[in-house]
Amino acid sequence: MGCGESQQSTTSANPSTVKTSDISIHEAVVEAEDPFVFHVTGRLQIPADDGQQGVATDGKFIYVQNTQQLFKYDLDGKLVTAGPKLMLHHGGIVYVKGLVYAAVSGCDSNGTNQHRVHVYNAQSLELIEKHDIGAHFTVCAGGITHRKGHFFVAESFFDDDHLDKIVEFNASFQHIKDYRIDFKSPYGIQGLEYLPGIDQFQIHSHGKVFYRINGRFESNSLISGKANFELQDLARLDANTLIVNNRQAQTLEFVKLATYPD
């Protein structure tokens, strides 16, 4: 579950029963402020018994992080394998060179120093490494992404009153720099992805609000938008397509970026 939410019971479903549902580009349109016009070109139904959190892809498989368990699907939505069910809150994930990195936290509204990055073998989903990043977060380590050998981990909250915070680490998760962005995402940042073609980050709140910001996190470069469903994590499939978590619908949305360069 996202920070600020109480756990709600959902109908448990076997992820192996995933079905795909192709939809017309005109049937579901997510419109936002110029230049953002997102067209949902496809959808996968991904049943979850403890809430979708993160999503990542290597272009051949899709990795879906539920609150306490990681799953691997092919691009048609067929379950390939499932990782171990673990404790603590698991949030955003990112795929890098055969590994899946997950932001993990105690996620306590009163504050906690339990913040880690878990590292999984992308083929088997075996948990192979943990990095302690507890000194750099206070509530919940939420989203995670990667750029040019460095990792960027964002904080999420239980309210809408905090400026967005992103922490940069090197490849060994040694601290590099903190960034404060002049924007207050609802419940903080739930997902972020680096878009190399335009040197921007796309950042998702836990509400319908999202934005793009340049690679230096300069607030004056920020352009915000608004989706028509509550957001979570996202992953770049290719130069034209994002995969966006729609947790409430238990789907993955394939979103065409109408203004994204080839």
What is each residue range found by the language model?
Residues 78-115:
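Blade-loop segments of beta-propeller domains
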Residues 59-60, 97-98, 148-150, 197-199, ...:
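Short coil/turn segments that connect the beta-strands within blades of beta-propeller domains
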Residues 74-78, 121-125, 170-174, 214-218, ...:
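Short loop/turn segments that connect beta-strands within beta-propeller blades
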Residues 70-71, 109-118, 160-167, 208-213, ...:
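Structural motif
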Residues 49-54, 87-97, 135-146, 184-194, ...:
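Repeated scaffold domains used in trafficking and secretory/extracellular systems
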Residues 24-49:
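A short helix->beta-strand "capping" segment at the edge of beta-propeller domains
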Residues 41-68, 89-92:
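Beta-strand-rich domains and repeat architectures in extracellular enzymes and scaffolds
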